[in-house]
Amino acid sequence: SGALLVNSRRFSVIETVKDSEGQVFVKIDNADASTDFGEGTTVNQILDWNTRYKYMRTHTALHLLSVCLPFPVTGGQITFEKGRVDFDMPESPDKDQITDRLNTMVEADYTVSYDLISQEELRERPQLIKTMSVKPPQNVDFVRLVRIGNSNKIVDLQPCGGTHVKSTSEIGKLFVSKIEKKGRINRRVSVVLQD
């Protein structure tokens, strides 16, 4: 989210995607034939902090959701309005109970920190990987681990390259907005921030 500044022209970023080979593509508005993005062109990024921060809060909330629902993760998505995770679980959970558990973890003000783990150690600890469809990068020596918790209690520990808040209290109040059945054993759980 944000904009690119190129040769004194401002282009709003519409979408950023990464392909299967790790190349990043940025879709912008107002580009035309006169737009010069040749090699060596200086490009400045202008970050939309409010949007980025909302994504960070939602992303971290989805980590907590994966703690509340300790089932394999089959998919997920974050938009400006909500975040969702698809779980491999046969029965739907109770929305109110999950909402209460999420808000309890938010209010606990757990620290979010990072460690690095070698590929070899990750292979020895496969239980750290919660996602069934998205695997941690295989072409790097070390993978970043996200740790949510404090010295007394680790709430979540898993490989993740996303953006997160520094503490769960930054997430703020949230609620489970919808639980959908997506196939015989898939449940899609959507979470919305209250502000």
Question: Can you describe what each PLM-predicted range is?
Answer:
Residues 1-195:
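Active-/binding-site microenvironments in catalytic and ligand-binding cores
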